[in-house]
Structures are given as structure tokens and as C-alpha cells.
Amino acid sequence: MPELPEVETLRQDLAREVVGRKIKAVSVANGRSVRRHPSAKHFRALLEGRTVKSVGRLGKYLLLTLDNGDTLVVHLGMSGQLLRVKSVKDPKPKHTHVVITFTQGGELRYVDPRTFGELFVSTPPMKSDGTPLSPVSGTAGGDGAAIRKAVPELAHLGFDPIEDLMSWDRFGYLLHQHSGGIKALLMDQSFTAGIGNLYSDEMLYQAGLRFDRPADSLTATEVRRLYRAIVETLADAIKHRGSSLADEQYRDLFGEIGEFQGSHQVYDREGQPCRRCRNNIVRVKTGGRSTFFCEHCQV
């Protein structure tokens, strides 16, 4: 599943490619991709004739703000891709479910083999304070709060390490309200938005913490180390345009793979030597997912 760095890479590319462009037509080949709407016709009517004013992101969600104040929200799910093509004559990949055509030419295509992702148009509430925010994100500063109020469907999302501002000690206070394993908490989208199985492993390795350490057991030094690892890992992955694994399901807006997979320290490196201590990286199954870590460097 694309995580925050992959979605942020798409956001940056979309901001350059589609802002200021008017939507000429929308076609929907699979209604499951727009399942929040009563029909594909309803979804199309909300988009056709509208102009994209800006592109944002919160957690794993892309947000295309339209000229009437509505927002086209895109979640890629497990296998979704957004592809920008200059010519409508370019062959469409298999599993192309939604196509947005612009008046100035070219298309934006949503491709999703497993159809767990979705697109929907959100209308801002009449009252800006009508939807309660997540207990975690509600205490944060930055741009995230404004996004949650404009798109109430995302009000449940927790702290976004890029869009929200939060001190490390406040982050530590929130961690200490939970006794479960730290990896599961980082992946809980109501606690931290945008982190998934891959980057949680990388962050915990950088912080020297085991995946199953109780969150409320972290010392102040460990909290600070984890906070720094979260911010630095995400920034580095964004700089390298995200991670594409062996299946190469993640592609950027132009169909190119990411580059950060070459910098993975533990993820998908079972049996390979740890780059710090040279002991082998271990893989265990937790909650139906694979977790990769170093038994010697992470405590």
C-alpha cells in the first residue's frame, strides 16, 4: 500500500501538472471506485466543468481542491495508481477505473487492480466546527487542522508528521496513553496518519526500538529518538520519491518507480546482514503482516 512518502510524491507532481486545469469530462468504468456516491453520474456531475485550484495531502489521502470549494479526495488503497498522460490516445492500462480528461488536453487515470481505493467529492460543511477532530490531531498545529475541517470525512485522521506541527514532548505524552506495541500504534491512522507497514519498520530501526515495545514504556530519550526517526525517515523517502517493491505496484504520476527501496535498512531484508551490527535481519508475522527488525540493534 502506498504510504505517506508515495502519496506526497504524487501530490508534488499533481501540483505541477493539473493545478489551473479545467475538467472537461469524467468517465467511470467501475462504480466501486466511486462507491460513496449514489451513482457514477452523480460523481461526474460534481467534477465536470470544475477547475483544479490546488493539491494537498493528509495521511494517505490526496486532495484536489476545486474552484467551487469542493475537494476531490483520492485514496489509493492497496494497489491504486494515478497516471498522467498527455494524449488521450495512449493505451489505457488494465484496471483503469476512472479517467479525468482536461480541456487543455491529456488525462488523469486512476488504475486499481484490487479496487480497495476510492475517489469521492467532499463538500465543506456549513459550519467549520461541525465535525470533531481526532483527539490526537486536535492538539496539533500546522495545516492539517484546516484540511480536516474542510474535508470532514478525514476528521478522524491522527497526527500527520508533515502537515501537522507537534512537539516531541507532546508526542511522547500521547504515546504514553497507550500500552500496546509501538508499531501497531504508529500504523493506527487515528494516531499517526500516513504511516504503514514499511515505514514503521524503518522508523523503529532508526530509533533502535522493537516493534512490540509497549508505547507507554518509552523513556524521554527514546521518545525524542523515535520522533526524530519518523520525521527524518519520511523526509528522506520523499526526497527519493518513495519506495517501489518487487511487484513495482507503486508508480509515480508518470509511471516511474520510486528510489527509496535501495535505502531500506530492514524492510524486506530478511536474512541479510544488518548494516550496523552485521547480524541477520529477522522477519516475524504480527497481526497478519510481516515485520522486519534487527534483534541486536532494536530493544
Where are the language model's segments positioned?
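Basic, nucleic-acid-binding surfaces and adjacent catalytic neighborhoods in DNA/RNA-processing proteins
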Residues: 22-43, 169-299
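Phosphate/anion-contacting hairpin/loop surfaces
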Residues: 72-194, 199-206, 214
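Surface-exposed binding/hinge segments that line
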Residues: 1-125
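Generic detection of long, well-ordered alpha-helical segments
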Residues: 1-4, 90, 161, 165, ...
